[in-house]
């Protein structure tokens, strides 16, 4: 009995049993919760009160704004890299004796274009206007002195690299026979006036302007027409006025081969351009949003489809998978998707790219047949496929198409051709009649590197015309 009593006395009571029960697992905060709690404590310490919904919204908006700045600038830097891509493509697809000249034209396109766009072009394109035709404020970034909005700087650099892209398209179409000084005049004129005026019609409301074409609902998200077709039609005007290279066409009118001296350079250039397009199209959101993922996918699919389609088309009709056609096919697909990259499906992007790859092959052959000498196919890639891409943006619009949409797209395409080709045709004729547009036959035969710049890209025996079997 004594043992039982002792045992009973040692048993814990109900309350004691609860106190000695195993404790429940502690709740462990996540890293995000710790950071959030620390932020709240810091706000409380600094302001003496807990953050409100309004202050949280302001903080989130500030983060989004900074992200928009960063993405827009990164995209601008990617598009700037496209200048190197154009230089490599054009240099590789032309003869060695003109390599320095082509590189210098591309460099000066950006240099002269940046100054002209800062001085005049940006104000014409994005300045305030009440007519829908062109802006009249914001020259030399003067708006910053008025509103002190730093977004102006990010937006300006992004639009400047676009303007320079439109200008450099012409370089390839007029390669190997254009006076360097005359080309500089063209570059300034296009970036100061021709490109900005049409840009104001289609994109003016992106800043302070507003254009008649965008008022109709014109779809050109990243510039199949605004950038590429404007540059392509200017290239067509230049090629028509300056005429073909010496020896390009025989007495019977048939084209003679003048192969580029280094298709490896041209291929590297296409890779750089493709890479830069991931800034060109997704960057046109000018916002760090989830939309950039789909735009990047559409861009890539169209470029890939364009290359494959051009390869198959060339293989079928030319009996060889011609490298220049394949390279231009990739670029054609990228140009074609630029207008609709934000408003079509991935499947539609593939279709757009495939058709662009077919179109560019036949377009290059067509211009050769009518004796318009375009050494790199710039007119076909940018002018023709830019027009196709603009039509496709309306035709494959994910939200549906209509006769009104397609009519507006056609109006935009025709307006771009009439404005860019007409204006540049007159400009090139004036230059031709005054200071001269074309080098002499002697200079053209010897190469523009030596006569225009006093330089050589390669040693005298690196690319011997005799050894390589190339035309002089």
Which role fits each region the language model picked out?
Residues 1, 12, 18-472:
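Hydrophobic alpha-helical transmembrane bundles of multi-pass membrane proteins
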Residues 2-6:
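Hydrophobic helical h-region of N-terminal Sec-dependent signal peptides
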Residues 8-10:
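Structural signal for alpha-helical transmembrane segments and their membrane-water exit/capping regions
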């Amino acid at each position: 009995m004594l043992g039982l009593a002792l045992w009973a006395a040692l048993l814990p009571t109900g309350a004691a049993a609860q106190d000695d029960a195993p404790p429940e697992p502690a709740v462990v905060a996540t890293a995000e919760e710790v950071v959030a709690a620390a932020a709240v404590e810091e706000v409380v310490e600094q302001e003496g009160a807990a953050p409100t919904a309004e202050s949280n919204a302001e903080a989130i908006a500030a983060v989004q704004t900074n992200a928009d700045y960063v993405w827009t600038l990164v995209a601008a830097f990617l598009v700037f890299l496209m200048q190197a891509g154009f230089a490599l493509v054009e240099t590789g697809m032309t003869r060695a004796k003109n390599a320095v000249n082509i590189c210098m034209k591309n460099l000066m396109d950006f240099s002269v274009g940046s100054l002209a766009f800062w001085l005049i072009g940006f104000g014409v394109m994005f300045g305030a206007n009440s007519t829908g035709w062109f802006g009249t404020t914001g020259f030399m970034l003067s708006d910053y002195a008025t509103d002190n909005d730093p977004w102006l700087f990010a937006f300006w650099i992004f639009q400047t690299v676009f303007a320079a892209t439109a200008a450099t398209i012409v370089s390839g179409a007029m390669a190997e026979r254009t006076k360097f000084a005359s080309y500089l005049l063209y570059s300034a004129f296009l970036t100061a006036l021709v490109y900005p005026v049409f840009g104001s019609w289609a994109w003016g409301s992106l800043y302070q302007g507003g254009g008649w074409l965008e008022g109709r609902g014109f779809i050109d998200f990243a510039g199949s027409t605004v950038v590429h077709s404007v540059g392509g039609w200017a290239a067509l005007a230049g090629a028509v006025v300056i005429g073909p290279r010496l020896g390009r066409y025989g007495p019977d009118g048939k084209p003679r081969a003048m192969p580029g001296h280094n298709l490896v350079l041209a291929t590297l250039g296409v890779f750089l351009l493709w890479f830069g397009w991931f800034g060109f199209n997704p960057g046109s959101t000018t916002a760090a949003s989830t939309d950039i993922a789909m735009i990047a996918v559409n861009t890539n699919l169209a470029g890939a489809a364009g290359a494959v389609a051009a390869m198959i088309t060339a293989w079928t009709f030319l009996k060889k998978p011609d490298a220049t056609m394949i390279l231009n096919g990739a670029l054609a697909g990228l140009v074609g998707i630029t207008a609709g990259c934000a408003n079509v499906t991935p499947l539609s992007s593939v279709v757009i790219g495939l058709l662009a790859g077919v179109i560019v092959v036949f377009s290059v052959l067509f211009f050769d047949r009518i004796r318009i000498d375009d050494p790199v196919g710039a007119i076909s890639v940018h002018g023709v496929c830019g027009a196709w891409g603009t039509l496709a943006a309306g035709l494959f619009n994910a939200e549906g198409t209509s006769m009104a949409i397609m009519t507006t797209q056609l109006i935009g395409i025709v307006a771009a051709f009439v404005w860019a080709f007409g204006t540049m045709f007159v400009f090139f004729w004036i230059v031709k009649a005054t200071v001269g547009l074309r080098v002499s036959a002697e200079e053209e035969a010897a190469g523009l590197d030596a006569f225009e710049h006093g330089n050589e890209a390669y040693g005298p025996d690196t690319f011997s015309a005799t050894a390589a079997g190339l035309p002089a």
